[in-house]
From Swiss-Prot:
The gene is NP. GO terms for biological process: symbiont entry into host cell; viral penetration into host nucleus. This is Nucleoprotein. One of its GO terms (molecular function) is RNA binding. Homomultimerizes to form the nucleocapsid. May bind host exportin-1/XPO1. Binds to viral genomic RNA. Protein-RNA contacts are mediated by a combination of electrostatic interactions between positively charged residues and the phosphate backbone and planar interactions between aromatic side chains and bases. It comes from Influenza A virus (strain A/Swine/Italy/141/1981 H1N1). The lineage of its organism: Viruses, Riboviria, Orthornavirae, Negarnaviricota, Polyploviricotina. A motif (Bipartite nuclear localization signal) lies at residues 198-216. It comes from the Viruses. Its main location: virion.
Length: 498
């Protein structure tokens, strides 16, 4: 972990802990994972799901969403104060899929939120276990990142759709805390700030009064989070300027867009964690695995080992390719939506194809789809090697990158060159000086122009055999740099809609 001075590791953020040593961190993360697993087993019992049905990823997602909804206090309060027809604010539910006479059927279930909170607390030693909830949110966020593109959202805030590699965590709820902030990409936070500034421009009272004071605190906090992700002094200084602005307006929006673009080359530090579906943890707990005793890490070999021997199923639509569905879920499990496909492919030991070539839609199934026509297949979530997840953007250099996505955000700490199309990125900076022209801008552009191909993005780290649990023998893969490395290249993914 880089600079462990004042920074808490993201395991600590994840578990809300104070500073702990490695063993304590592994134990508290293990406790969190075990709690999710115990909760899942109990829910499967309550819903009378068979073993096979409990391993269905669609059922896992429904159960996960129910517990998130049960603990969403803000929304629960809102629903109680603004009752809408046909919606019981005290209940939550979703589709559960059962196998009846060789066919899949959908059953819509409704549950008391209170009851679900009880089951969750019981599984977590009577505590609210917010860390476990955040963990589930990050898994959903990683799944969204791999499934959808955010072109519309990018365009609405004045950013360029080719900046999609900066949008990790863009669907995470506000309440996801420090662990959520750690996994958000530079573009995601820039976009949240731009939305705030736009509201302030349109609504004169946005920054005024008691509410305005709270808004201002939130604005400055978010600026600091974004500042902390940048690795160069000039980018950080520019964030100070945005934060200290008396009355944030268009100049700040331009500065934020400029900074987000600069992150395509001067990459920010964004954490990556392997968050798996609840059913995977449930299976492990059911087979007698004691997560708290064994300890667990979201950024090491543990999630890879867990996926090596977990069998998870998924419903597959008639014209979908099961191998492609597996790739989608594998990428989501390892938070690898914006990783270089060549690196992902090497680790997975299977070719990983760009989003546009996948014959699969998202994992979740809409209520108007005919489930009876669907089959279920085993998801192939195993890997050939494992690698440590990174929380840095790596150093930067030139390679050919693609038209659709013009940069990557590395997930795995593996020595390689990072591809980006300097000409394309730099072209985005020409003739846009609505924001302040400053020494900082000039300095940032100079650094971007001088980024050299020789700078390896990760020195000395490689991938490891699955038998090498202590990461003693790194294998440094060699990549064919002429291949396409971007996942969203020439893309036709669906848009993310709430």
């Amino acid at each position: 972990m880089a600079s462990q001075g004042t920074k808490r590791s993201y395991e600590q953020m994840e578990t809300g802990g104070e500073r702990q040593d490695a063993t304590e961190i592994r134990a508290s993360v293990g406790r969190m994972i075990g709690g999710i697993g115990r909760f899942y087993i109990q829910m499967c019992t309550e819903l009378k799901l068979s073993d096979y049905e409990g391993r269905l990823i669609q059922n896992s997602i429904t159960i996960e969403r129910m517990v998130l909804s049960a603990f969403d206090e803000r929304r629960n309060k809102y629903l109680e104060e603004h009752p809408s027809a046909g919606k019981d604010p005290k209940k939550t539910g979703g589709p559960i899929y059962r196998r009846i006479d060789g066919k899949w059927t959908r059953e819509l279930i409704l549950y008391d939120k209170e009851e679900i909170r009880r089951v969750w607390r019981q599984a977590n030693n009577g505590e609210d276990a917010t860390a476990g909830l955040t963990h589930i949110m990050i898994w959903h966020s990683n799944l969204n990142d791999a499934t959808y593109q955010r072109t519309r959202a990018l365009v609405r805030t004045g950013m360029d759709p080719r900046m999609c590699s900066l949008m990790q965590g863009s669907t995470l709820p506000r309440r996801s805390g420090a662990a959520g902030a750690a996994v958000k990409g530079v573009g995601t936070i820039a976009m949240e700030l731009i939305r705030m500034i736009k509201r302030g421009i349109n609504d004169r009272n946005f920054w005024r009064g008691e509410n305005g004071r709270r808004t201002r605190i939130a604005y400055e906090r978010m600026c600091n989070i974004l500042k902390g992700k940048f690795q160069t002094a000039a980018q950080r200084a520019m964030m100070d300027q945005v934060r200290e602005s008396r009355n944030p307006g268009n100049a700040e929006i331009e500065d934020l867009i400029f900074l987000a673009r600069s992150a395509l080359i001067l990459r920010g530090s964004v954490a990556h964690k392997s968050c798996l579906p609840a059913c995977v943890y449930g299976l492990a707990v059911a087979s007698g695995h004691d997560f708290e005793r064994e300890g667990y890490s979201l950024v090491g070999i543990d999630p890879f080992k867990l996926l090596q021997n977990s069998q998870v199923f998924s419903l597959i639509r008639p014209n979908e390719n099961p191998a492609h569905k597996s790739q989608l879920v594998w990428m989501a499990c390892h938070s690898a939506a914006f990783e270089d496909l060549r690196v992902s492919g090497f680790i997975r030991g299977k070719k990983v194809v760009p989003r546009g070539k996948l014959s699969t839609r998202g994992v979740q199934i809409a209520s108007n789809e005919n489930v009876e026509a669907m089959d279920s297949n085993t998801l192939e979530l195993r890997s050939r090697y494992w690698a440590i997840r990174t929380r840095s953007g790596g150093n930067t250099n030139q390679q050919r990158a693609s038209a659709g996505q013009i940069s990557v955000q590395p997930t795995f700490s593996v020595q390689r060159n990072l591809p980006f199309e300097r000409a394309t990125v730099m072209a985005a900076f020409i003739g846009n000086n609505e924001g302040r022209t400053s020494d900082m801008r000039t300095e940032i552009i100079r650094m971007m122009e001088s980024a050299k191909p020789e700078d390896l993005s990760f020195q000395g780290r490689g991938v490891f055999e699955l038998s090498d649990e202590k990461a003693t023998n790194p294998i440094v893969p060699s990549f064919d740099m002429n291949n396409e490395g971007s996942y969203f290249f020439g893309d036709n993914a669906e848009e993310y809609d709430n």
